[in-house]
Swiss-Prot record:
<feature type="region of interest" description="G1">
    <location>
        <begin position="19"/>
        <end position="26"/>
    </location>
</feature>
<keyword id="KW-0648">Protein biosynthesis</keyword>
<dbReference type="InterPro" id="IPR031157">
    <property type="entry name" value="G_TR_CS"/>
</dbReference>
<dbReference type="InterPro" id="IPR009001">
    <property type="entry name" value="Transl_elong_EF1A/Init_IF2_C"/>
</dbReference>
<keyword id="KW-0460">Magnesium</keyword>
<dbReference type="InterPro" id="IPR050055">
    <property type="entry name" value="EF-Tu_GTPase"/>
</dbReference>
<dbReference type="InterPro" id="IPR004541">
    <property type="entry name" value="Transl_elong_EFTu/EF1A_bac/org"/>
</dbReference>
<keyword id="KW-0963">Cytoplasm</keyword>
<keyword id="KW-0547">Nucleotide-binding</keyword>
<feature type="region of interest" description="G5">
    <location>
        <begin position="174"/>
        <end position="176"/>
    </location>
</feature>
<feature type="binding site">
    <location>
        <begin position="81"/>
        <end position="85"/>
    </location>
    <ligand>
        <name>GTP</name>
    </ligand>
</feature>
<feature type="binding site">
    <location>
        <position position="26"/>
    </location>
    <ligand>
        <name>Mg(2+)</name>
    </ligand>
</feature>
<protein>
    <recommendedName>
        <fullName>Elongation factor Tu</fullName>
        <ecNumber>3.6.5.3</ecNumber>
    </recommendedName>
</protein>
<feature type="region of interest" description="G3">
    <location>
        <begin position="81"/>
        <end position="84"/>
    </location>
</feature>
<keyword id="KW-0251">Elongation factor</keyword>
<feature type="region of interest" description="G4">
    <location>
        <begin position="136"/>
        <end position="139"/>
    </location>
</feature>
<feature type="binding site">
    <location>
        <begin position="19"/>
        <end position="26"/>
    </location>
    <ligand>
        <name>GTP</name>
    </ligand>
</feature>
Length: 394
Protein backbone atom coordinates (compact mmCIF):
# COMPACT_ATOMS: atom_id res chain seq x y z
CA UNK A 1 0.00 0.00 0.00
CA UNK A 2 1.38 3.42 -0.94
CA UNK A 3 2.17 5.78 1.91
CA UNK A 4 -0.58 8.29 2.55
CA UNK A 5 0.40 11.88 1.84
CA UNK A 6 0.37 13.99 5.03
CA UNK A 7 -2.36 16.57 4.48
CA UNK A 8 -1.46 19.92 5.96
CA UNK A 9 -4.97 21.37 5.85
CA UNK A 10 -5.35 21.83 9.63
CA UNK A 11 -2.99 23.45 12.12
CA UNK A 12 -0.86 20.90 14.00
CA UNK A 13 -0.59 20.83 17.81
CA UNK A 14 1.40 18.53 20.13
CA UNK A 15 -0.29 17.40 23.34
CA UNK A 16 0.31 14.78 26.01
CA UNK A 17 -1.42 13.16 28.98
CA UNK A 18 0.11 13.78 32.42
CA UNK A 19 -0.96 12.77 35.94
CA UNK A 20 -0.55 10.28 38.77
CA UNK A 21 0.06 6.59 38.12
CA UNK A 22 -3.19 4.59 37.62
CA UNK A 23 -5.38 7.68 37.34
CA UNK A 24 -6.25 6.65 33.78
CA UNK A 25 -3.89 8.52 31.43
CA UNK A 26 -3.59 5.59 29.03
CA UNK A 27 -7.32 4.73 29.22
CA UNK A 28 -8.11 8.34 28.39
CA UNK A 29 -5.72 8.28 25.42
CA UNK A 30 -7.46 5.12 24.18
CA UNK A 31 -10.90 6.67 24.79
CA UNK A 32 -10.03 9.80 22.79
CA UNK A 33 -9.00 7.70 19.78
CA UNK A 34 -12.04 5.43 20.08
CA UNK A 35 -14.60 8.25 20.37
CA UNK A 36 -13.00 10.30 17.58
CA UNK A 37 -12.73 7.17 15.39
CA UNK A 38 -16.54 6.96 15.38
CA UNK A 39 -16.55 10.43 13.85
CA UNK A 40 -13.89 9.48 11.29
CA UNK A 41 -11.20 11.63 12.94
CA UNK A 42 -8.88 8.93 14.29
CA UNK A 43 -7.86 5.31 14.20
CA UNK A 44 -9.04 3.62 17.39
CA UNK A 45 -6.08 2.42 19.47
CA UNK A 46 -6.65 -0.06 22.30
CA UNK A 47 -5.27 0.36 25.81
CA UNK A 48 -2.82 -2.51 25.22
CA UNK A 49 -1.45 -0.95 22.04
CA UNK A 50 -0.75 2.31 23.86
CA UNK A 51 0.50 0.71 27.07
CA UNK A 52 3.15 -1.31 25.21
CA UNK A 53 5.01 1.89 24.41
CA UNK A 54 8.14 1.48 22.30
CA UNK A 55 11.44 2.70 23.71
CA UNK A 56 13.06 5.68 22.06
CA UNK A 57 16.47 7.22 22.45
CA UNK A 58 16.74 10.97 22.82
CA UNK A 59 20.18 12.49 23.51
CA UNK A 60 21.45 9.11 24.66
CA UNK A 61 18.56 8.47 27.06
CA UNK A 62 16.07 5.64 26.61
CA UNK A 63 12.47 6.72 27.07
CA UNK A 64 9.25 4.77 26.58
CA UNK A 65 6.58 6.83 24.86
CA UNK A 66 3.43 6.00 22.95
CA UNK A 67 2.44 8.31 20.10
CA UNK A 68 -1.08 8.48 18.73
CA UNK A 69 -2.56 10.94 16.28
CA UNK A 70 -6.08 12.20 15.85
CA UNK A 71 -8.02 15.17 14.52
CA UNK A 72 -10.89 17.38 15.59
CA UNK A 73 -12.92 19.66 13.30
CA UNK A 74 -10.27 22.34 13.84
CA UNK A 75 -6.86 20.74 14.38
CA UNK A 76 -4.54 17.81 13.84
CA UNK A 77 -3.02 16.46 17.08
CA UNK A 78 0.01 14.36 17.92
CA UNK A 79 -0.49 12.93 21.40
CA UNK A 80 2.15 11.35 23.66
CA UNK A 81 1.51 9.07 26.61
CA UNK A 82 4.28 7.66 28.82
CA UNK A 83 3.79 4.47 30.81
CA UNK A 84 6.22 5.15 33.65
CA UNK A 85 6.75 8.15 35.90
CA UNK A 86 10.51 8.23 35.20
CA UNK A 87 9.67 8.34 31.48
CA UNK A 88 7.71 11.56 32.03
CA UNK A 89 10.53 13.24 33.90
CA UNK A 90 13.01 12.29 31.16
CA UNK A 91 10.58 13.13 28.38
CA UNK A 92 9.74 16.58 29.63
CA UNK A 93 13.30 17.60 30.47
CA UNK A 94 14.91 16.30 27.27
CA UNK A 95 12.09 17.63 25.12
CA UNK A 96 11.79 14.25 23.42
CA UNK A 97 8.11 15.05 23.21
CA UNK A 98 7.50 18.75 22.87
CA UNK A 99 4.14 19.62 24.40
CA UNK A 100 2.18 22.66 23.24
CA UNK A 101 -0.32 21.75 25.95
CA UNK A 102 -1.09 18.97 28.41
CA UNK A 103 -4.17 17.03 29.48
CA UNK A 104 -3.90 16.45 33.23
CA UNK A 105 -5.77 13.33 34.33
CA UNK A 106 -6.97 13.20 37.94
CA UNK A 107 -9.04 10.31 39.32
CA UNK A 108 -12.10 11.72 41.10
CA UNK A 109 -11.94 8.76 43.49
CA UNK A 110 -8.44 9.77 44.70
CA UNK A 111 -8.11 13.49 44.05
CA UNK A 112 -4.67 15.03 43.42
CA UNK A 113 -1.79 12.71 44.42
CA UNK A 114 2.02 13.22 44.72
CA UNK A 115 2.74 12.69 41.01
CA UNK A 116 -0.17 14.99 40.09
CA UNK A 117 1.76 17.72 41.87
CA UNK A 118 5.09 16.63 40.42
CA UNK A 119 3.78 16.61 36.85
CA UNK A 120 2.23 20.08 37.25
CA UNK A 121 5.56 21.34 38.63
CA UNK A 122 7.42 19.71 35.72
CA UNK A 123 4.99 21.27 33.24
CA UNK A 124 5.68 24.65 34.84
CA UNK A 125 9.47 24.16 34.79
CA UNK A 126 9.65 22.96 31.20
CA UNK A 127 7.31 25.68 29.97
CA UNK A 128 4.16 23.77 28.93
CA UNK A 129 1.94 26.75 27.97
CA UNK A 130 -1.47 25.38 29.00
CA UNK A 131 -3.14 22.55 30.90
CA UNK A 132 -6.67 21.18 30.49
CA UNK A 133 -7.98 18.81 33.18
CA UNK A 134 -9.93 15.57 32.75
CA UNK A 135 -11.44 14.37 36.04
CA UNK A 136 -11.59 10.63 35.43
CA UNK A 137 -13.47 7.81 37.21
CA UNK A 138 -16.39 10.10 38.12
CA UNK A 139 -18.63 7.02 37.85
CA UNK A 140 -16.97 5.69 41.03
CA UNK A 141 -17.99 8.73 43.11
CA UNK A 142 -21.63 8.99 44.23
CA UNK A 143 -21.34 12.20 46.22
CA UNK A 144 -21.49 15.42 44.11
CA UNK A 145 -19.95 17.38 47.02
CA UNK A 146 -16.89 15.16 46.80
CA UNK A 147 -16.52 15.90 43.07
CA UNK A 148 -16.71 19.61 43.86
CA UNK A 149 -14.06 19.23 46.56
CA UNK A 150 -11.68 17.42 44.19
CA UNK A 151 -12.24 20.13 41.57
CA UNK A 152 -11.35 22.83 44.13
CA UNK A 153 -8.19 20.94 45.12
CA UNK A 154 -7.12 20.69 41.47
CA UNK A 155 -7.68 24.43 40.90
CA UNK A 156 -5.68 25.31 44.03
CA UNK A 157 -2.83 23.04 42.95
CA UNK A 158 -2.71 24.64 39.49
CA UNK A 159 -2.70 28.13 41.04
CA UNK A 160 0.14 27.10 43.34
CA UNK A 161 2.34 26.43 40.29
CA UNK A 162 1.28 29.61 38.48
CA UNK A 163 -1.22 28.06 36.08
CA UNK A 164 -4.56 29.93 35.97
CA UNK A 165 -6.43 27.36 38.08
CA UNK A 166 -9.66 29.37 38.29
CA UNK A 167 -9.97 29.58 34.50
CA UNK A 168 -8.73 26.09 33.62
CA UNK A 169 -11.33 23.86 31.93
CA UNK A 170 -12.06 20.80 34.11
CA UNK A 171 -14.13 18.13 32.36
CA UNK A 172 -15.74 15.36 34.42
CA UNK A 173 -16.15 11.89 32.96
CA UNK A 174 -15.02 8.29 32.78
CA UNK A 175 -12.53 7.03 30.21
CA UNK A 176 -13.42 3.38 30.81
CA UNK A 177 -17.16 4.08 30.37
CA UNK A 178 -16.38 5.96 27.16
CA UNK A 179 -14.44 2.94 25.90
CA UNK A 180 -17.49 0.79 26.72
CA UNK A 181 -19.64 3.07 24.57
CA UNK A 182 -21.56 4.87 27.33
CA UNK A 183 -23.16 7.94 25.69
CA UNK A 184 -22.65 10.42 28.55
CA UNK A 185 -19.02 9.35 28.94
CA UNK A 186 -18.46 9.71 25.18
CA UNK A 187 -19.90 13.23 25.43
CA UNK A 188 -17.34 14.03 28.14
CA UNK A 189 -14.56 13.05 25.70
CA UNK A 190 -15.99 15.37 23.01
CA UNK A 191 -16.28 18.12 25.64
CA UNK A 192 -12.62 17.53 26.57
CA UNK A 193 -11.54 17.82 22.92
CA UNK A 194 -13.53 21.04 22.52
CA UNK A 195 -11.67 22.43 25.56
CA UNK A 196 -8.30 21.29 24.17
CA UNK A 197 -9.18 22.95 20.82
CA UNK A 198 -10.08 26.28 22.36
CA UNK A 199 -7.90 26.50 25.48
CA UNK A 200 -4.52 25.21 24.27
CA UNK A 201 -3.03 28.06 22.22
CA UNK A 202 -1.90 27.58 18.64
CA UNK A 203 1.93 27.38 18.77
CA UNK A 204 3.91 30.00 16.89
CA UNK A 205 5.53 28.46 13.83
CA UNK A 206 9.35 28.50 13.80
CA UNK A 207 9.44 30.48 10.51
CA UNK A 208 7.66 33.39 12.21
CA UNK A 209 10.35 33.71 14.90
CA UNK A 210 13.60 35.71 14.60
CA UNK A 211 16.33 34.04 12.50
CA UNK A 212 18.78 31.71 14.27
CA UNK A 213 21.21 29.14 12.85
CA UNK A 214 23.75 27.17 14.92
CA UNK A 215 27.09 26.89 13.11
CA UNK A 216 28.04 23.27 12.41
CA UNK A 217 30.95 23.74 10.02
CA UNK A 218 33.01 26.53 8.45
CA UNK A 219 35.10 26.52 5.30
CA UNK A 220 36.55 29.02 2.89
CA UNK A 221 35.86 29.06 -0.83
CA UNK A 222 38.76 30.65 -2.71
CA UNK A 223 37.79 33.91 -4.35
CA UNK A 224 34.38 33.94 -2.64
CA UNK A 225 34.94 34.06 1.09
CA UNK A 226 33.84 32.16 4.18
CA UNK A 227 30.83 29.85 4.36
CA UNK A 228 29.14 28.70 7.57
CA UNK A 229 26.86 25.68 7.34
CA UNK A 230 24.08 24.48 9.61
CA UNK A 231 20.37 23.83 9.94
CA UNK A 232 18.23 26.93 10.36
CA UNK A 233 16.53 26.51 13.75
CA UNK A 234 13.98 29.27 13.28
CA UNK A 235 13.06 32.26 11.17
CA UNK A 236 13.96 33.18 7.61
CA UNK A 237 17.21 34.58 6.14
CA UNK A 238 17.33 36.53 2.87
CA UNK A 239 20.30 37.55 0.76
CA UNK A 240 22.09 40.74 1.86
CA UNK A 241 20.50 40.69 5.33
CA UNK A 242 22.64 41.72 8.29
CA UNK A 243 23.37 39.12 10.96
CA UNK A 244 25.31 38.79 14.20
CA UNK A 245 27.57 35.87 15.11
CA UNK A 246 27.48 35.30 18.85
CA UNK A 247 28.87 32.99 21.53
CA UNK A 248 32.40 31.77 22.40
CA UNK A 249 34.12 34.90 20.95
CA UNK A 250 33.20 38.57 20.85
CA UNK A 251 30.01 39.30 18.91
CA UNK A 252 30.63 40.11 15.22
CA UNK A 253 28.35 41.79 12.70
CA UNK A 254 28.32 40.81 9.05
CA UNK A 255 25.96 40.30 6.11
CA UNK A 256 24.85 37.18 4.25
CA UNK A 257 25.91 37.63 0.62
CA UNK A 258 24.73 34.22 -0.63
CA UNK A 259 22.61 31.30 0.55
CA UNK A 260 23.22 27.81 -0.77
CA UNK A 261 21.30 24.56 -0.31
CA UNK A 262 22.18 21.25 -2.02
CA UNK A 263 24.70 23.19 -4.16
CA UNK A 264 21.94 25.47 -5.48
CA UNK A 265 21.65 29.17 -4.72
CA UNK A 266 18.56 30.38 -2.87
CA UNK A 267 17.04 33.82 -2.35
CA UNK A 268 16.04 32.83 1.16
CA UNK A 269 16.51 29.99 3.63
CA UNK A 270 13.91 29.11 6.25
CA UNK A 271 13.48 27.10 9.45
CA UNK A 272 14.37 23.45 8.84
CA UNK A 273 16.64 24.08 5.83
CA UNK A 274 20.24 22.85 5.86
CA UNK A 275 22.15 25.72 4.27
CA UNK A 276 25.54 27.30 3.70
CA UNK A 277 25.70 31.05 4.31
CA UNK A 278 28.40 33.09 2.58
CA UNK A 279 29.46 35.76 5.08
CA UNK A 280 30.87 39.12 4.03
CA UNK A 281 34.40 40.06 5.10
CA UNK A 282 35.06 37.14 7.44
CA UNK A 283 38.05 34.80 7.51
CA UNK A 284 37.63 31.12 8.26
CA UNK A 285 39.25 31.56 11.68
CA UNK A 286 36.77 34.30 12.70
CA UNK A 287 33.95 31.81 13.16
CA UNK A 288 33.67 28.31 14.65
CA UNK A 289 31.29 25.46 15.38
CA UNK A 290 29.23 26.22 18.49
CA UNK A 291 28.57 29.84 17.62
CA UNK A 292 25.16 30.89 16.32
CA UNK A 293 24.19 33.28 13.54
CA UNK A 294 21.18 35.41 14.47
CA UNK A 295 19.02 38.36 13.55
CA UNK A 296 20.95 41.20 15.27
CA UNK A 297 20.05 41.84 18.90
CA UNK A 298 17.62 38.94 19.34
CA UNK A 299 19.80 36.64 21.49
CA UNK A 300 22.67 37.34 23.88
CA UNK A 301 25.59 35.14 24.96
CA UNK A 302 25.65 34.15 28.65
CA UNK A 303 27.78 32.16 31.09
CA UNK A 304 25.60 31.80 34.20
CA UNK A 305 22.25 30.05 34.43
CA UNK A 306 19.97 27.85 36.50
CA UNK A 307 18.71 24.60 35.01
CA UNK A 308 16.38 21.72 35.71
CA UNK A 309 18.49 18.60 35.18
CA UNK A 310 17.85 14.86 34.95
CA UNK A 311 20.90 12.73 35.79
CA UNK A 312 21.12 9.39 33.97
CA UNK A 313 21.27 6.14 35.89
CA UNK A 314 24.11 3.65 35.48
CA UNK A 315 21.72 1.43 33.47
CA UNK A 316 21.06 4.32 31.07
CA UNK A 317 24.78 4.66 30.44
CA UNK A 318 25.27 7.44 32.97
CA UNK A 319 27.54 7.82 35.97
CA UNK A 320 27.94 5.00 38.49
CA UNK A 321 28.60 7.39 41.37
CA UNK A 322 27.07 10.62 42.70
CA UNK A 323 28.54 14.04 41.99
CA UNK A 324 29.13 16.87 44.45
CA UNK A 325 29.31 20.65 44.56
CA UNK A 326 31.70 22.19 41.98
CA UNK A 327 31.28 19.20 39.63
CA UNK A 328 32.83 20.21 36.24
CA UNK A 329 31.38 18.35 33.24
CA UNK A 330 30.86 19.58 29.67
CA UNK A 331 27.58 21.18 28.67
CA UNK A 332 26.56 20.41 25.10
CA UNK A 333 24.58 23.30 23.60
CA UNK A 334 23.26 22.81 20.05
CA UNK A 335 26.54 21.91 18.36
CA UNK A 336 29.35 22.15 20.91
CA UNK A 337 30.63 21.25 24.39
CA UNK A 338 31.60 23.93 26.92
CA UNK A 339 33.01 23.17 30.37
CA UNK A 340 30.99 24.48 33.29
CA UNK A 341 31.01 24.36 37.07
CA UNK A 342 27.88 23.20 38.97
CA UNK A 343 26.58 24.61 42.25
CA UNK A 344 24.08 22.35 44.04
CA UNK A 345 20.94 23.76 45.72
CA UNK A 346 21.26 24.66 49.41
CA UNK A 347 20.99 21.62 51.64
CA UNK A 348 21.79 19.17 48.82
CA UNK A 349 25.05 17.35 49.59
CA UNK A 350 25.26 15.29 46.43
CA UNK A 351 23.33 14.26 43.34
CA UNK A 352 22.72 10.59 42.63
CA UNK A 353 22.30 8.95 39.22
CA UNK A 354 18.53 8.99 38.49
CA UNK A 355 17.94 12.27 40.35
CA UNK A 356 16.08 15.29 39.08
CA UNK A 357 17.78 18.48 40.40
CA UNK A 358 17.92 22.25 39.95
CA UNK A 359 21.55 23.32 39.37
CA UNK A 360 23.34 26.62 39.02
CA UNK A 361 25.98 26.52 36.28
CA UNK A 362 28.88 28.79 35.38
CA UNK A 363 30.41 28.16 31.94
CA UNK A 364 34.03 29.02 31.12
CA UNK A 365 33.03 30.72 27.83
CA UNK A 366 29.77 32.50 26.95
CA UNK A 367 27.26 30.65 24.75
CA UNK A 368 24.16 31.92 22.94
CA UNK A 369 21.34 30.89 25.24
CA UNK A 370 17.74 31.57 26.06
CA UNK A 371 15.41 30.47 28.82
CA UNK A 372 13.86 27.05 28.08
CA UNK A 373 16.80 25.97 25.92
CA UNK A 374 17.83 22.33 26.25
CA UNK A 375 21.30 20.83 26.59
CA UNK A 376 23.08 17.58 27.39
CA UNK A 377 25.65 17.10 30.15
CA UNK A 378 28.61 15.03 29.01
CA UNK A 379 31.82 13.56 30.37
CA UNK A 380 34.38 12.65 27.75
CA UNK A 381 31.77 12.52 25.01
CA UNK A 382 29.24 10.31 26.80
CA UNK A 383 25.92 11.74 27.95
CA UNK A 384 25.43 11.69 31.73
CA UNK A 385 22.48 14.06 32.01
CA UNK A 386 19.96 16.26 30.25
CA UNK A 387 18.77 19.69 31.21
CA UNK A 388 16.74 22.75 30.40
CA UNK A 389 17.55 26.35 31.30
CA UNK A 390 15.06 27.69 33.84
CA UNK A 391 16.68 31.09 34.43
CA UNK A 392 19.56 33.14 33.05
CA UNK A 393 21.64 34.77 35.78
CA UNK A 394 24.00 37.20 34.00
Amino acid sequence: MAKEQFQRNKPHVNVGTIGHVDHGKTSLTAAITSVLAKKGFAEARGYDQIDAAPEERERGITISTAHVEYETENRHYAHVDCPGHADYVKNMITGAAQMDGAILVVAASDGPMPQTREHILLARQVGVPAIVVYMNKCDLVDDPDLLELVEMEIRELLNEYEFPGDDTPIIKGSAVKALEGDAAAEDSIMELMAAVDSYIPQPERPVDQPFLMPVEDVFSISGRGTVATGRIERGVIKKMEEVEIIGIKDTQKTAVTDIEMFRKLLDEGQAGDNVGLLLRGLKKEDIERGQVIIKPGTVKPHKNFKAEVYVLTKEEGGRHTPFFNNYRPQFYFRTTDVTGCCTLPEGVEMVMPGDNVNLEVQLITPIAMEKAMRFAIREGGRTVGAGRISEILD
